[in-house]
Amino acid sequence: MVNLPRDRMDQVVKRFEMLEAQMSAGPAPDAYVKMASEYAELQDMVAKVRQLRSAEHEQADLEAMLADKGTDAEMRALAEADLPDVEERIEALQKDIQILLLPKDAADDKNAILEIRAGTGGDEAALFAGDLFRMYERYAAERGWRFETVSASDGDAGGFKEIIATVSGKGVFAHLKFESGVHRVQRVPATEASGRIHTSAATVAVLPEAEEVDIEIRAEDIRIDTMRASGSGGQHVNTTDSAVRITHLPTGIMVVQAEKSQHQNRAKAMQILRARLYDLERSKADEERSESRKSQVGSGDRSERIRTYNFPQGRVTDHRINLTLYKLDRVMMGELDEIVDALIADHQSKLLADIGLDG
């Protein structure tokens, strides 16, 4: 039997019913929008709690029927057949409610900025960075998310030295946040005549996209420089001074955008700067909450090797949860759900243990 905080569940249902009544009374538009947002957040939890209560009543009735010596044989047989199904349903609902009761990461519903950089391994690392980029692009397409390249620095032999994209849609950061870290590849490069396996790496950073309300950037804290865009590898060369470099003076964080429109460059550079500053704030808060930091999948450190992609064996291994899948080709085609779901489940189970709800 799972240990659930019944008082808290009752409070959630009461709050939901109160909001329902207030919204029916026709409040002012601003108040209605706020209420509707909270109402939507509570809806899943309340539905599960009501289903659980109904199933528990059903269980009690069946147990009473079985305990009653006056119950005829046919009814007893029906009750005995139904009871295991009801108990199974109750257990599943309890687990669902446990997850819904977990502390919510405020950034989970946000869009994300995805940054991929080639690491050790030269040209092969840049090619792998390109492979990872396409993997995430396909994953985003599978989930119906919008995926847009913000900037790219091409590798000398293909792929990317660095590429940045925005990913927009429902649950983007919640699903991508565990991708941050070092991704290692083991394969035979196309240029390797002897067939020797090379190891190279790329670093992935997933940042929650920050709104202006999330992070304040004061005008006096930034320096904006414009410069001539030279393009990468001779591409996108622009003879006007359109490239923009924004430096955040207090932290030294620098963002450069070098597409053709100076106005767009400034807006995109500010978008990335805001995300990096917001991420910095979140990291500091995580460090202060050292106990909760232990519950994260891995350390969250972007220098931590999190996953290995072994092409000769067709294997992908996530080292944080010791998960190995022998379907590398499908993973590279964007089939990431099995890995992502396992990472989320592992994170949730550790959170449940932390707050004493692991039953």
Swiss-Prot record:
The alphabetized UniProt keywords are: Cytoplasm, Methylation, Protein biosynthesis
Q: Which residues does the record list as N5-methylglutamine (modified residue)?
A: 235
Please name the source species.
Mesorhizobium japonicum (strain LMG 29417 / CECT 9101 / MAFF 303099)
Q: Where is this region: Disordered?
A: 283-309
Indicate the principal place this protein occupies in or around the cell: cytoplasm
Compositional bias segments (type: Basic and acidic residues): 283-294
Q: Which GO terms describe its molecular function?
A: translation release factor activity, codon specific
Entry protein name: Peptide chain release factor 1
Which SUPFAM superfamilies is this protein grouped with? Release factor
Which is a Gene Ontology cellular component entry for this protein?
Answer: cytoplasm
Q: Which gene encodes it?
A: prfA
